């Protein structure tokens, strides 16, 4: 029996309603699009997790549930929008390992057989891992800890730190190592030094600062000559004597410098004068400061002192290492320190009349014509030992004349 058309339409509508009421199976296109969205979410979550782990040092300690919750909240805020439908059994719907195993980072070492190609030291006994044919040993696959086979039995259970992130090794390890390296020095220095200052160190430091100050003052005027402010203080100060009779006097004088309160810079000219008059062997300060010019010096500035070979110079100031202040008769000025030679009381000054080329193997030196030299020795077999600047050796006496 054929049902009427109205009934057929009603039944058709009922079937349509039933079909819409029941859940239709997803199409392959919708399933693939859903899987692609899940893969994108997984990649983004893994990238964010790696970036967060590389910037933090909390991975070295076991995290608890309270530590995992802020990270989950941070990831939820970082990816706003409608969350995709979770498919049962998919990786996104599975709980994280940190939530299930809060102490997963505290696993033990996983040692494996390893052949070491480079020289490696055992982390337990600190001896090199060697072998007859190959350097066999044990190595942890995660933290790369290397030990001997014999050291594995006596090794206590230790927590494996895992593989260090590159960002942590780069930004955190070096400062920690530097602080640990110099930590013992920081502890020892206050105990060793204290508040006591060595007087010798104070005097040397003050002399260095004074020399630098004079150099700066001389460079400002266009020449390396030191200023004339301290010349009056150093006129009467002699240099150290080389004679045997003045050894104790000079030693007492040098030791007394550090007993003055202001780094030994008090006025001690009176003491120098009294010391020079003690005993018959004391030398004249003027004779102690006598120099002879070795070369000719043409003045470059108004304050420079013109010199010719053989001129006798009285030293007035030697605070600067390169430029000294001296006096020739009634002329006063600055001259290079390496252009003069000191003359003692018992020394003689000679001039070379012709060029002499000496043999170094025989202890001789070369002298040019009109070169000045100083000696305190006597003639031996026609030769005499002279001193000219930094050169010292034998020259024949017939090429020298007195100045």
Swiss-Prot record:
GO biological process, one term: positive regulation of voltage-gated calcium channel activity
Zinc finger (Phorbol-ester/DAG-type): 108-160
GO molecular function: transmembrane transporter binding; zinc ion binding
Compositional bias per record (Low complexity), positions renumbered to this chain: 222-232
Membrane topology field: Peripheral membrane protein
Residue span, SH3 domain: 286-345, 348-403
Tissues where this protein is expressed: Expressed predominantly in brain Detected in brain neurons, more specifically in hippocampus, cerebellum and inferior olive. Highly expressed in urinary bladder, and detected at lower levels in adrenal gland. Detected at very low levels in heart, liver, lung and kidney.
UniProt-listed Pfam families: C1_1, SH3_2, SH3_9, STAC2_u1
Superkingdom of the source species: Eukaryota
Residue ranges with Polar residues bias: 19-36
Residue spans crossing the bilayer: none
Keywords carried by this UniProt record: Cell membrane, Cytoplasm, Membrane, Metal-binding, Repeat, SH3 domain, Zinc, Zinc-finger
UniProt-listed Gene3D superfamilies: 3.30.60.20, SH3 Domains
One Gene Ontology term, aspect cellular component: cytosol
InterPro entries documented for this protein: C1-like_sf, PE/DAG-bd, SH3-like_dom_sf, SH3_domain, STAC1/2/3, STAC1_SH3
Family matches, as PANTHER family: SH3 AND CYSTEINE-RICH DOMAIN-CONTAINING PROTEIN, STAC
Protein name: SH3 and cysteine-rich domain-containing protein
Organism: Mus musculus
Top-level taxonomy: Eukaryota, Metazoa, Chordata, Craniata, Vertebrata
Gene that encodes the chain: Stac
């Amino acid at each position: 029996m054929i049902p009427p058309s109205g009934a057929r339409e009603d039944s058709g509508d009922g079937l349509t309603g039933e079909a819409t009421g029941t859940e239709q199976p997803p199409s392959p296109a919708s399933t693939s699009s859903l899987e692609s969205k899940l893969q994108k979410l997984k990649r983004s979550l893994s990238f964010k997790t790696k970036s967060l782990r590389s910037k933090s040092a909390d991975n070295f300690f076991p995290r608890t549930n309270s530590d995992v919750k802020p990270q989950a909240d941070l990831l939820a805020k970082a990816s706003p929008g409608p969350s995709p439908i979770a498919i049962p059994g998919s990786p996104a719907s599975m709980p994280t390992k940190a939530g299930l195993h809060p102490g997963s980072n505290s696993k033990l070492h996983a040692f494996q057989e390893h052949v070491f190609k480079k020289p490696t030291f055992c982390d337990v006994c600190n001896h090199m891992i060697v072998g007859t044919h190959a350097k066999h040993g044990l190595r942890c696959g995660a933290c790369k800890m290397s030990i001997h086979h014999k050291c594995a039995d006596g090794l206590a259970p230790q927590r494996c730190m895992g593989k260090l992130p590159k960002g942590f090794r780069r930004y955190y390890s070096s400062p920690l190592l530097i602080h640990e390296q110099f930590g013992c020095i920081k502890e020892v220095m206050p105990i060793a030094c204290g508040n006591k200052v060595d007087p010798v160190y104070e005097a040397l430091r003050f002399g260095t600062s004074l020399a630098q100050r004079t150099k700066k003052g001389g460079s400002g005027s266009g020449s390396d000559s030191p200023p004339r402010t301290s010349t009056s203080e150093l006129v009467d100060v002699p240099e150290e004597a080389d004679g045997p009779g003045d050894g104790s006097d000079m030693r007492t004088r040098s030791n007394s410098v550090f007993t003055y309160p202001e780094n030994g810079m008090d006025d001690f000219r009176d003491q120098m004068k009294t010391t020079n008059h003690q005993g018959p062997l004391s030398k004249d300060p003027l004779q102690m400061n006598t120099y002879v010019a070795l070369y000719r010096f043409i003045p470059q500035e108004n304050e420079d002192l013109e010199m010719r070979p053989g001129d006798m110079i009285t030293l007035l100031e030697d605070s600067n290492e390169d430029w000294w202040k001296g006096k020739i008769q009634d002329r006063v000025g600055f001259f290079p320190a390496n252009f003069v030679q000191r003359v003692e009381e018992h020394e003689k000054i000679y001039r070379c009349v012709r060029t002499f080329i000496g043999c170094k193997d025989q202890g001789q030196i070369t002298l040019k014509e009109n070169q000045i030299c100083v000696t305190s020795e006597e003639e031996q077999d026609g030769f005499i030992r002279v001193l000219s600047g930094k050169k010292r050796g034998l020259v024949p006496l017939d090429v020298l004349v007195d100045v």
